[in-house]
């Protein structure tokens, strides 16, 4: 089984690559495979037998609120070039995002198909929304929608690492937000690879929902940290949670949020 992972140098892509070692995984850097160049990508698929594409490459993730059209066009161009070469592989797994939705409103327990009722204002979100629409109408294309993800190897800039390392943490909007532990993404990817997945759009979320403060306090308990370092601002912000029914229906053996946070020790 030959797998191409785009964006394999980023946090999500590199994690997935490390945990699919039982397969023959291609992880080209940007200078080795230019996703913006249709001819380059077409040539790659001519010269390599690829079964699965896992699309993790993105643009604009660092500037989520930007409306710069460059981030919109870049995100769509990369995906368009992969889509145009769909005859060169069997399946594509897209790492989607809850930012496919309009985050200026509350998004609680959103279902997989709800994104069609949204057109995000941000370039990153709109790009991801359009990609999700194309995937919905393309056979053998899958969208795994990640709301938030975490792992003990993540950057110190991420929320849970800040809770551990910083002397004071301010939660401006204490909303309910879904996070998934990165190891729990792998079983669903393998389910798709093995042909055992009956759904092509899946919210990667757990059934139980937590506020940011609840997760921060939980982590403080596990790490023996002083909870008083946490300051909560607004508790009435917009939530960002998904319906877990489809993911739960597969009865995958998942580690879960609580044990994932324990693993930061």
What function would you assign to each model-found segment?
Residues 1-21:
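N-terminal Rossmann NAD(P)H-binding glycine-rich loop of SDR-like oxidoreductase domains
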Residues 35-74:
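NAD(P)H-binding glycine-rich loop region in Rossmannoid oxidoreductase-like domains
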Residues 44, 182, 211-217, 231-265:
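Conserved C-terminal active-site "lid" loop/helix of NAD(P)H-dependent oxidoreductases
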Residues 52, 66-93:
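NAD(P)-cofactor binding segment of oxidoreductase domains
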Residues 80-121:
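Conserved Rossmann-fold NAD(P)-dependent oxidoreductase catalytic core, especially the SDR/UDP-sugar
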Residues 121, 133-177, 182-184, 191:
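NAD(P)-dependent short-chain dehydrogenase/reductase
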Residues 150-154, 174-186, 202-221, 255:
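Substrate-binding strand-loop-helix patch
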Residues 163, 167, 188-191, 195-238, ...:
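Mid/C-terminal beta-alpha module of Rossmann-like enzyme folds, strongest
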């Amino acid at each position: 089984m030959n797998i191409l992972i785009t964006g394999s140098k980023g946090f999500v892509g590199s994690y997935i690559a490390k945990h699919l070692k039982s397969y023959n995984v291609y992880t080209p850097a940007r200078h080795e495979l230019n996703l913006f160049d249709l001819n380059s990508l077409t040539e790659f698929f001519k010269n390599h037998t690829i079964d699965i594409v896992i699309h993790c490459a993105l643009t604009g993730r660092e500037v989520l609120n930007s409306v710069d059209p460059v981030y919109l066009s870049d995100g769509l161009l990369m995906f368009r070039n992969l889509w145009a070469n769909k005859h060169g592989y069997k399946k594509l797994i897209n790492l989607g995002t809850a930012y496919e939705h309009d985050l200026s409103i509350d998004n609680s327990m959103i279902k997989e198909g709800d994104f069609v009722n949204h057109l995000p204002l941000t370039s990153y979100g709109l790009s991801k929304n359009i990609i999700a629409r194309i995937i919905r109408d393309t056979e053998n294309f899958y969208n795994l929608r990640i709301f938030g993800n975490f792992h003990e190897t993540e950057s110190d800039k991420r929320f849970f690492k800040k809770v551990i390392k910083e002397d004071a943490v301010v939660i401006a909007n204490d909303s309910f937000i879904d996070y998934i532990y990165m190891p729990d993404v792998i079983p669903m990817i393998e389910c798709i690879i093995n042909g055992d997945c009956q759904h092509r759009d899946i919210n990667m979320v757990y059934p139980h929902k937590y506020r940011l403060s609840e997760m921060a306090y939980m982590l403080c308990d596990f790490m023996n940290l002083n909870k008083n370092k946490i300051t909560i601002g607004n508790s009435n912000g917009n939530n960002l949670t998904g319906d877990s029914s489809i993911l739960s229906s597969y009865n995958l053996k998942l580690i879960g949020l609580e044990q994932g946070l324990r693993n930061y020790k």
